[in-house]
Amino acid sequence: MWAIAGLISVLLAQAAAFDCSAKELEHYNFELLKGIHSVTSLKDTPPSQTNLTWYFGICEPIKEGLDACPQNSDVCGITSIILKGDSKNRVISEIVSFNTNLQKTYEPFSDSEIDSTGIAISYTGATWGDNSINAALRFVCPPKNNEHILDKFKLDSWDGKKLKASMYSKAACITSDKDKLKPPPKKPDNGESWGWFTWIFIFLVLFLSIYIVGGAWFQYNKGNAIDFSSALREVLDNFVELLKGIPAFSREIIEKFTSNSNRGEYSAV
């Protein structure tokens, strides 16, 4: 019973994740960003350094095992203390998580100051210790004269209560269905891959090899040849005779068809 309840809760959490097929995102192309993104802030705090890394799951939740993030997080922040000269050993001091089942709001915006539009996704209802925390992710459609790095998160602020992060991406531009993510075009074949003719040739060679060797072995086992080499020579001779007869056979077939067509023309007259 408990196992079934746990499975249901996991499925519900995944269903509520940052879903690229959500109705509010149907005019955008967030499939371009599908995956786990991160942004890191490093602060010098002698005699140590404080590393704050935020992870963002776009169109899929963050799985357990990524750093110290809890399972099924949409957004996860990990703060760790690193002693100078000992970067391998670190102490995790803070873990902040916005779970997939939190309430999310999607709000399109238009910013005249940067001459651009986009959509903001907000998380509410999360807790971190005794604190209630929220998150606002702002996805901006890059303007014409864009100087920002695309598809990279920027940590705008984190004060222990609200996370603000932003990203400039074409995924945040209103897109028609026909312009949405399409599979990348196939690279032209520059002779690096084998064509169908090559495969036919290979199979033909294999078939002939099996036919010749198998036929020789059959002749030898039946006692029709003194030794295997004689049997092989006999099969090869028969095969050569067969090849010589192919042109005459083809000519006979062609003549038969052409003569039939001529008879049809005469009868029509």
Curated annotation (Swiss-Prot):
GO terms for cellular component: cytoplasmic vesicle membrane; Golgi membrane; mitochondrial membrane; phagophore assembly site membrane. Disulfide bonds join 20-59, 69-76, 141-173. The chain crosses the membrane at residues 194-214. Residues 1-17 form the signal peptide. Residues 18-175 form the MRH domain. The keyword Transmembrane helix applies. Pfam families: ATG27. It comes from the Eukaryota. Keywords: Autophagy, Cytoplasmic vesicle, Disulfide bond, Golgi apparatus, Membrane, Mitochondrion, Protein transport, Signal, Transmembrane, Transmembrane helix, Transport. It is found in: Cytoplasmic vesicle membrane; Golgi apparatus membrane; Mitochondrion membrane; Preautophagosomal structure membrane. It is a single-pass type I membrane protein; Single-pass membrane protein. GO terms for biological process: autophagy; protein transport. Residues 215-269 are cytoplasmic. InterPro entries: Autophagy-rel_prot_27, Man6P_isomerase_rcpt-bd_dom_sf, MRH_dom. Residues 18-193 are lumenal. The keyword Transmembrane applies. Its main location: membrane. Effector of VPS34 phosphatidylinositol 3-phosphate kinase signaling. Regulates the cytoplasm to vacuole transport (Cvt) vesicle formation. Plays a role in ATG protein retrieval from the pre-autophagosomal structure (PAS) and is especially required for autophagy-dependent cycling of ATG9. Belongs to the ATG27 family. This is Autophagy-related protein 27. The gene is ATG27.
